[in-house]
Amino acid sequence: MKTKLMITIFSCLLLWSMLLLLSFSNIFKHQLLGATINVGSKDSVKPRDRLLGGLLTADFDEDSCLSRYQSSLYRKPSPYRTSEYLISKLRNYEMLHKRCGPGTDAYKRATEKLGHDHENVGDSSDGECKYIVWVAVYGLGNRILTLASVFLYALLTERIILVDQRKDISDLFCEPFPGTSWLLPLDFPLMGQIDSFNREYSHCYGTMLKNHTINSTTIPSHLYLHLLHDYRDQDKMFFCQKDQSLVDKVPWLVVKSNLYFIPSLWLNPSFQTELIKLFPQKDTVFYHLARYLFHPTNQVWGMVTRSYNAYLSRADEILGIQVRVFSRQTKYFQHVMDQIVACTQREKLLPEFAAQEEAQVTNTSNPSKLKAVLVTSLNPEYSNNLKKMYWEHPTTTGDIVEVYQPSRERFQQTDKKLHDQKALAEMYLLSLTDKLVTSALSTFGYVAQGLGGLKPWILYTPKKFKSPNPPCGRVISMEPCFLTPPVHGCEAKKGINTAKIVPFVRHCEDLRHYGLKLVDDTKNEL
């Protein structure tokens, strides 16, 4: 009897222990899940909008591309609303791409017409698909900006965008359109030729205009658009309204570009009304397009989340500093270091250094905050020196400053898979910061600010190896800069300032007398 009682008591204790353990396990799991979901949201525990206000479709398998639906977990709720018109336009485009994309009968018919220039290809029947092929050139920042530009043009003209997959595009980004692919098939008829396309190519639009070999009755099966920094006046005519009516008839366009040419699309009257409906807030174009198009692959996303959770998630505030020095010498420059410190302290982005005797007073007056500084640069010396400064000196505010640099590559290695993946991860990490400092004229910085919806402080270009005064200034628009736009209007050879045609296209802060960018606040003068 006594033994039976002991067994009963032991069984009850064992059952109670198991229930208690299960309870603790569920609590821990819930807390871990909560920590994952609320990462990056220090001021809010609101549920995240995984579809970004309808910008994204729910028609994807989440595991195949974790970043697509998880990115909102790492961002504060967006203050920039997506227009219903843009959402509708994207859903319609997705259906069009599914009907006309690789592997479809429509794609097969379209490729069969390539090379038949003497046939009247411009008179194709309604419903035939038209295409624009994006060829990867220059660095990753340039590629992302041009890909967004080409996609917007495709959206406006109802063309199918296909991207050159021979570089590392599929190692960087997930497919953006459900049920189809945006990768240009490797057996594309012109694949063996497109690398040699240049300004002198017989089917280059600028060359055909120059030689008078294209008009409304002689429509070629394809055109090459040379929209690189060295393009000629004839190449720039692509942006003009009259020329668009001609280009629109060509079934296949192949484009090489290293420019964010979206501002010039806004200057075209035939596109302007549609663009205003798509983007009522005019300085959010790249922001919305980038969040729709560019979803890092799982490998890249792993780099992002591991870095964020390990080094940034616990901070009260995150500051991003992107350092790009345009010099033949890929080395550390002291004047750039001085400029970084001057900018961040002058603009109150980082605390100033205090004398040792002040530190004791400061540290007891207010609770200290943790500021995480994410530095991206090919050189490690900038982050090393910043870290050393804030380790050796107390701050006037008592704040703790931690400095972190994910990679230290020393020199650019475009088209090397791991290098480009690290670069993309760093762009994305910069976009997750609360405040951002970027280098003038850097497409790397443009991508980060646009993706994050941030208006950064730009480090002005140094002159004669001296830190400029002021060292930096804040931009009025998060849009990237069109660095080498047409310098005059379509209807005049000269005398037209393209930054004064419409109030929402202005000169860039980092290229005041030449570059163009979209702005939304028309009260600011540059």
Curated annotation (Swiss-Prot):
Listed Pfam families: XG_FTase
Lumenal side: 26-526
Record's subcellular location: Golgi apparatus, Golgi stack membrane
Residues bearing attached sugar chains per UniProt: 211, 215, 363
Enzyme class: transferase
Keyword Transmembrane set for record: yes
Keywords, in A-Z order: Cell wall biogenesis/degradation, Glycoprotein, Glycosyltransferase, Golgi apparatus, Membrane, Signal-anchor, Transferase, Transmembrane, Transmembrane helix
Documented EC number(s): 2.4.1.-
InterPro entries (UniProt xref): XG_FTase
Cytoplasmic-side positions: 1-4
Record's GO cellular component terms: Golgi cisterna membrane
Family named by the database record: Belongs to the glycosyltransferase 37 family.
Name of this chain's protein: Probable fucosyltransferase 7
Lineage: Eukaryota, Viridiplantae, Streptophyta, Embryophyta, Tracheophyta
